[in-house]
């Protein structure tokens, strides 16, 4: 109506501009006709035009008071003599205005008439379409209400105060679903008795438009009774014209219907309003067009209420879950934990669900862009995925943006809302219906979107071997056996293994039952040290004899049958005195069984003085090898002494060095250590060392083979090199150990005779074999002692030969051989140098 009034105002303005030239034409013509007769007057006396030139918004200035006209001059008519010749003045005929002024006026009138006709035509067409949509929505509402009455038993309708008021449900009891149409004139939403939901047939596309409360008072109801959702309240704050848009202004209890299962943003996202919300009647807003300030105030009040209701709904319900378009109507509803216990919401089946929902999102207000953009992105992704997949819409970010945009208007109108809320009488709250048992909560899938690729999925048996095997292709490192025979058997040091309790990897000892502490059948006892037991186990694996054979060889004293290695292993695993007592105390009839290694040692303990026998037999078996080693060492030292005394070449080198080193030539001797410094001392010519000049003289005297003779000195004194590697103190220690071992063997025989085992047959064999050994051992020891004395005498003689005091070198008797070894290395280097120079010459 405002637009129509604006068009009519423009038409009248055009008409006034068109007729204004005619009004200006009549006074001009009048003045032209009476120019000769009328007196000259002031131009201010003319009357203003009919349509003033002032703006329509400001009133014209008041007219000036009329001024009195001056009295006309008296004129007397003079008549000539010939009165017949008198010509009386006649007024000419009025001339019609020019045709050029009529053409614009006629065209302006025609244009105004055309605009008026077009305005009435479009207005009538708009009224016709609106009434047609109202009829369809009313018929659809009646059909759906009949179908609901037939399918679902409903309780009696609730009482409403007025027809034009919105029926409001409690926020905690009812939740509206798609497919239900609730008008203000009808009863409120009815909760079905059964939680099962029956699908509805497809609905026409045009039923998405809003239903208004009456046809007679359409304009007044649009201005007075506006029901706001969070989306509609935003639109109402922007402009008054946006409030008329049916897509942006939606009631909380009106469900939009279309052939799409997806909800419109305004209907789906509007929260259930509280039953205590104020009802606004038509009488409160009858003067809203004439009072724009009140309209803005009402809009802010509605926006604040819808904001509070939307924030409460968002906290109670959380994130709504909307399923994508499918053939089942149950997949297109919002599912929340409270919705299952309260009511059901139906959604229609659509053949093109995404296209219509995108149109609705495009027509939404700009402040809902966050939510629209979120829903569009989900619909675009749902087209590529399976239609039966579920997806979630996150409206937390949209609610935050809406809250930030609404906080400032709420702060400005806080006092107005408080005064308005105090003035409105609130109806008593309705009793909520009994709650139904809640089903188990739905667990969202871990992956909201999943694209199914064409192809057969491989089972676990069909997977490639590389997926399960991992690193089986790598070659495993070869494990080496742990040398347990190198572990000391009688270690008295405490370490980490000794501090750990036995079987510490099991459960706590306090939690064990009493049966675990009792001895069980075939339970092995751990008497020996773990390391010692492991050594015995390794020995048994390498043993080629049985336990009885080993015991018999120990009784008879046959050390050849056992061997040195076996005897050494038995000597290392000798148990301590406590372990021997424990092993002897065990009997064969005992419930607790011994380990194989402990059983082996227990059988060995049946032999008297078994481990002393082992030591004695080990000494007997290794005696010959030790004697041979000592004899070889003594013979090498004696041969080295003879070689040093009888070497002609060594004597020539020492004499030539003595002559070249002393300028006077009267030197008689020098210390043997001086041979090592001949390389560093220059000769008389000052160009070469003394050793170089001595070797050169020897080669010249011997001829061509002289250099080769000097080099062969190293091979002649080879025994001296070997003697230098020996340690005379170690040799003498080995001799003393050998003598002690023989003494231990004789002690074993003495112990056996004292204990009374000498009459036994087994002991007699052992004693016979040991006595024979002692006889041969005594003779060999005497020989070793004689060789040791002769060797010591030869070393002292050769030391004195090279002018070394043997008393000072008693700690290092073999030092002479060490000096000779080092001198031979220097001599070989000089010979190689001379060969190189001779070859170049």
Curated annotation (Swiss-Prot):
GO biological process: actin nucleation
Biased composition (Polar residues): 139-152, 279-293, 502-512
Domain FH2 as annotated: residue spans: 469-841
Ranges that cross the membrane: 102-122
UniProt keyword terms in alphabetical order: Membrane, Signal, Transmembrane, Transmembrane helix
Region (Disordered): 137-166, 254-297, 403-512
Compartments (UniProt record): Membrane
Keyword Ligase: no
Membrane topology label: Single-pass membrane protein
Amino acid composition bias (Pro residues), ranges on this chain: 426-444
Stretches with biased composition (Low complexity): 254-278
Molecular function as annotated in GO: actin binding; actin filament binding
GO cellular component terms attached to this protein's record: membrane
Pfam families the record matches: FH2
Signal peptide residues on this chain, from the entry's feature table: 1-25
Keyword Signal listed: yes
Induction: Up-regulated during gall formation induced by root-knot nematodes.
Cited InterPro entries: FH2_Formin, FH2_Formin_sf, Formin-like_plant
SMART domains from the UniProt entry: FH2
Function recorded in the entry: Might be involved in the organization and polarity of the actin cytoskeleton.
Family to which the UniProt record says this protein belongs: Belongs to the formin-like family. Class-I subfamily.
UniProt-recorded name of the protein: Formin-like protein 10
